[in-house]
């Protein structure tokens, strides 16, 4: 989900 993108940062 979108939250994964934040962790990928």
Swiss-Prot record:
Q: Which residues cross the membrane?
A: none
Query: Which processes are annotated in GO (biological process)?
Result: neuropeptide signaling pathway
Q: Does the keyword NADP apply?
A: no
Residues with Leucine amide modification = 9
Keywords from the named record: Amidation, Neuropeptide, Secreted
What pairs make up the disulfide bonds?
none
Please indicate which superkingdom the organism of origin belongs to.
Eukaryota
Q: Can you list the GO cellular component terms from the UniProt entry?
A: extracellular region
**Which compartments is it annotated to reside in?**
Secreted
What is the documented function of this protein?
FMRFamides and FMRFamide-like peptides are neuropeptides.
Family in the record: Belongs to the FARP (FMRF amide related peptide) family.
Protein name in UniProt? Extended FMRFamide-3
Originating species: Tyrannophasma gladiator (Gladiator)
